[in-house]
Design a protein with these regions (language model features):
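P-loop NTPase nucleotide-binding/switch module
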Residues: 1-4, 37-39
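C-terminal engagement/docking regions of AAA+ P-loop ATPases
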Residues: 139-221
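Walker B catalytic acidic pair
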Residues: 4, 10-11, 22
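Residue-level signature of catalytic and energy-coupling elements of molecular machines
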Residues: 23, 70, 128, 165, ...
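Conserved C-terminal "switch" segment of AAA+ ATPases
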Residues: 73-145, 171-175, 179, 200-202, ...
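Canonical AAA+ ATPase core
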Residues: 11-19, 27-105, 109-118, 166-168
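The start of beta-strands in P-loop NTPase/AAA+ ATPase cores
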Residues: 5-6, 192
C-alpha cells in the first residue's frame, strides 16, 4: 500500500514501532527497501496520518524524531451541526457517495515547483530564525519558558515554516511572503515539534500557548 501517491495512515499510533519506522523512513528517503532491494516512490508522495487524542489503550508512542518528519499537525474538532446532519444523511440512506477528483498529479507537482519560486526576503528568514531560536533559548529573548520547554524545535521546523508560509502566500495570490503568512501557519508547523516538560503539563500549558507567547515577544518585521 505504500506505493501510491497519497497514503492515509489511519491511527498511526496503533501501528507497531517497526511499521511506524518503515513508513516514516519512506517519507524521508522517498524510497523503500525490501529484502535488500531499493524501490523509488513515485512523485508526488503525500502521507496523511491520523491519531486519536482520547483513546491511548493499545497505542504506541511515536518517537519525537519521527514526528518531526511530518510537515504539519492539524487539529480537527467536532463537526458543526449542519455537517453532522450531512454525515447522518449520507450514512443512514441508500445515497451513493461519489468522490470526484479535483486535481491531477501533474498539477500538484506544478504547484510544488511554483511554491519554491515564492519570494521570502532575508527579513522574513531572520524572523523565522528568531522564532525557532526562541523555542531553544527562551532566556535570550527574556521569555520565562525554560521550565516549560524541554526541547525546542529542530532545523526541520525552520524549513517547513518557510515552506508553509510560501504556500499560504500562494493561496492568497501573492508571490512573496509577509509576516502574516508566518503567523497563520506557525501553530500547525510547530505544535508537534515542541517537547514540553511535566511542569507544563501540570500547569495545563500546551504547545499552542507557548507559540502564542513567543509570537507576542518576538518583534514582527
Amino acid at each position: 500500500p505504500i506505493f501510491h501517491n497519497f497514503v492515509l495512515a489511519d491511527e498511526i499510533n496503533r501501528a507497531p514501532p517497526k511499521v511506524q519506522s518503515a513508513l516514516l523512513e519512506s517519507m524521508q528517503e522517498k524510497q523503500v527497501s525490501i529484502h535488500g532491494e531499493t524501490f523509488q516512490l513515485e512523485k508526488p508522495f503525500l502521507v496523511l496520518a491520523t491519531q486519536n487524542p482520547i483513546e491511548n489503550e493499545g497505542t504506541y508512542k511515536l518517537p519525537e524524531a519521527q514526528i518531526d518528519r511530518f510537515a504539519l499537525k492539524i487539529l480537527i474538532d467536532y463537526p458543526t451541526k449542519d455537517q453532522e446532519i450531512e454525515i447522518i444523511e449520507k450514512n443512514t440512506s441508500n445515497l451513493q457517495i461519489k468522490v470526484n477528483p479535483i486535481v491531477e498529479l501533474k498539477q500538484i507537482l506544478e504547484m510544488q515547483k511554483f511554491n519554491e519560486k515564492i519570494y521570502a526576503d532575508t527579513i522574513i528568514l531572520k524572523y523565522v530564525a528568531s522564532l525557532i531560536d526562541a523555542t531553544r533559548n527562551p532566556k535570550k529573548y527574556e521569555l520565562d519558558l525554560e521550565n516549560i520547554i524541554e526541547y525546542g524545535a529542530s532545523p526541520r521546523a525552520s524549513i517547513w515554516l518557510i515552506k508553509a508560509a510560501k504556500a499560504n502566500a500562494m493561496i492568497n495570490g501573492r508571490g512573496y511572503v509577509i509576516p502574516e503568512d508566518v503567523k497563520q501557519v506557525i501553530h500547525e508547523v510547530l505544535r508537534h515539534r515542541l517537547i514540553l516538560t511535566f511542569e507544563a503539563e501540570a500547569e495545563e500549558v500546551n504547545s499552542d500557548k507557548v507559540i502564542d507567547i513567543i509570537l507576542e515577544k518576538i518583534p514582527s518585521p
